[in-house]
A protein has these predicted regions:
Chain B
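An alpha-helical appendage that flanks or caps ligand/catalytic pockets
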Residues: 120-158, 199-296, 328-332
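Conserved, mostly hydrophobic/aromatic
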Residues: 3, 30, 34, 42, ...
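Hydrophobic faces of well-ordered beta-strands that scaffold small-molecule active sites
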Residues: 3-7, 38-40, 69-71, 99-103, ...
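Internal, glycine-rich beta/alpha segment that forms the wall or movable "lid"
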Residues: 80-188, 199-206, 213-215
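Acidic (Asp/Glu)-rich catalytic clusters
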Residues: 31-32, 57-66, 88, 92-98, ...
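Active-site mouth loops of central-metabolism enzymes
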Residues: 7-20, 74-82, 165-175, 269-279
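N-terminal small/glycine-rich loop or linker at the start of catalytic domains
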Residues: 1-14, 108-111, 150-165, 258-271
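N-terminal beta1-alpha1-beta2 module of alpha/beta enzyme domains
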Residues: 1-70, 167, 332
Length: 219, 332
């Protein structure tokens, strides 16, 4: 059976990811801040087929939970409901937009390692290095020459594989990285990967130039 | 169809004094050339000269006759709606009823620290303040208001009143769907910022109209406008080449281009929809916004990236004399 997906965050990124998840045939729930009627309208227009829920309910019934809220509001994520799920961090820290957030300032680790520590659950980093318009525009079937790649960085091999399968089903070539901290090269300002919309071959050669080896297991 | 320009007063290498003088002169030209709107934004950073657009709009009002005086956007989350209303009501009186406000949350966050607001509150700050501003704009009499984000008002008279019966307050939307719901529920006109492909904004426009209908607003009172970066040259290739260095520098503020915007990415943005090109290309792209989104106004950011005034003036002239008349005719 297909993994059930929950997207926490119904903003620019969250609505696109929910739409891609529905298109990939995954049972998809989506949660947002604000009142349920507004969420219902947004989902009906932007991600029809996804089921609007509260964050806690959405996470509790899912196998994979994609967190796509502004980092400044990470505390609104129901951390307890994430236990036992595969949790994906699709977020980025960029102070001109997020404001300066002390937890992420001077962070030498990947921002996902800080997210992991704050949420208290293992996380996988993916979807963060492509813009929401591009995520929407670049979905392609497997084997298409134009297909773009999304890196999937994590510590837990099974979790990375589960997210890689979802990435593939959504229309992107997954490139697994281990450990989670290797995903630092996917972040804004740290390499030529963020926002570059690379194919798998281009992403692999960029990673190679950065001295980052992809993880062996590739679905 | 209304056509206009907007600016943040990008500094480039110019002095603030020179940039402000250029802006007033460009607005005067836009008025004489028949453009409908000049809108000024605010950024609270050294690379932009405009943090107090209402003062510059007041200077512009004194040297123009017809052009509407708007914002792009007024960062309402960190302003006092009472003061904003007073300033724009005053501008409206000075200008003979030409003032408008486009209220938004802004792209940057500096104003939160400068004016003592907590960025984590940005949602409630914008929501409460927008509602209060709309109340002030729509209701003639004394206002009583309670909320979290400023001191209460008890039968407060906010004066002067605008010259227009209702001072227009648009809601500026950058792509967040909740913002389109808000604009629709409040029955306010919506301005959507679009830089590349306008197609994804169709969903925002649908959400806006449906939210307005659910709240019982008359569809006749709804309006959608769009705007984004714009450069018009005599030829397609010439426009691209002239504008590229300034745009690449400007977009290095974005995280994906912090090392500079590659030419290939720039060309891709133009292909996707960025309004850079010959007059005919810009006409086609504005008409595409109109077809996809039903806009009744387009405003282009016409002085991006600290271009020399001569380049800005030339692009502005082409927009006013070769783009605007054709768009008006095709959309009539």
């Amino acid at each position: 059976m297909s993994a059930r997906v929950a997207v926490l965050g119904a903003g620019k990124v969250g609505t696109v990811l929910a739409r891609l998840s529905v298109a990939a045939g995954r049972p998809t729930a989506i949660a947002g801040s604000g009142d349920p009627a507004a969420l219902g309208l947004i989902v009906d227009v932007l991600a029809p087929g996804a089921v609007p829920m509260t964050g806690a309910d959405a996470a509790a019934q899912a196998d994979i939970v994609i967190v796509a809220v502004p980092l400044a509001r990470l505390e609104t994520v129901p951390a307890a409901a994430l236990k036992g799920r595969v949790v994906v961090d699709a977020m980025n820290y960029w102070p001109p937009v997020d404001g300066v957030l002390p937890a992420w300032e001077d962070a030498t680790p990947s921002s996902s390692e800080i997210v992991r520590d704050l949420l208290g659950v293992d996380v996988v980093k993916s979807f963060n290095h492509m813009g929401y318009h591009e995520l929407d525009a670049w979905t392609r079937p497997a084997g298409d020459l134009d297909r773009r790649a999304l890196a999937v960085a994590g510590d837990d091999g099974a979790a990375v594989t589960a997210v890689a399968e979802l990435v593939d089903a959504m229309g992107f070539d997954p490139v697994p990285l281990r450990p989670l901290g290797a995903g630092r090269v996917l972040q804004p300002g740290s390499s030529d990967i963020f926002g570059a919309d690379l194919t798998r071959a281009e992403l692999l050669s960029t990673l190679d130039a950065l001295g980052v080896a992809p993880a062996a297991a590739c679905p | 169809m209304e056509l206009g320009i907007y600016s943040f007063g990008d500094s480039g290498t110019h002095s603030t004094r020179q940039r402000l003088a250029d802006l007033v002169a460009q607005a005067r030209y836009a008025d004489e050339a028949g453009l409908d709107v000049i809108a000024l934004g605010e950024h609270h950073r050294p690379d932009f000269t405009l943090s107090a657009p209402e003062l510059v709009l007041a200077a512009i009002s004194a040297v123009t006759e017809r052009i509407r005086l708007s914002t792009a956007v007024t960062v309402l989350s960190t302003a006092d709606p009472v003061r904003v209303y007073q300033q724009f009501a005053t501008l409206d009186q000075l200008s003979g009823g030409r003032a408008e406000i486009v209220a938004g949350r802004g792209a940057f966050t500096e104003s939160f620290g400068l004016f003592g607001y907590d960025l984590r509150e940005y949602e409630v700050l914008f929501d409460e303040k927008l509602r209060l501003l709309l109340t002030l704009a729509r209701e003639e009499g004394p206002v009583t208001w309670r909320g979290r984000t400023r001191e209460p008002l008890d039968d407060a008279l906010v004066t002067p009143r605008a010259l227009q019966p209702v001072l227009p307050v648009w809601v500026g939307v950058g792509g967040t769907p909740q913002s389109a719901v808000r604009a629709g529920r409040l029955g306010a006109p919506m301005f959507v910022a679009i830089f590349t492909d306008p197609a994804p904004a169709r969903g925002l426009v649908e959400i806006y109209h449906r939210a307005a209908a659910n709240a019982g607003h008359d569809p006749a009172g709804l309006r959608v406008a769009s705007g984004g970066h714009m450069y018009v040259g005599h030829t397609s290739q010439g426009a691209r080449d002239e504008f590229y260095p300034y745009y690449a520098e400007y977009l290095s503020k974005l995280p994906q281009f912090s090392g500079g915007m590659p030419r290939a990415a720039y060309d891709e943005w133009i292909r996707a929809g960025l309004l850079v090109g010959s007059p005919q290309e810009v006409i086609d792209k504005i008409m595409n916004h109109r077809e996809l989104l039903g806009i009744s106004r387009y405003v282009g950011q016409f002085d991006v990236g600290g271009m020399p005034a001569g380049m800005v003036d030339k692009s502005l002239e082409l927009f006013a004399t070769e783009v605007a008349p054709v768009v008006r005719k095709e959309s009539a």
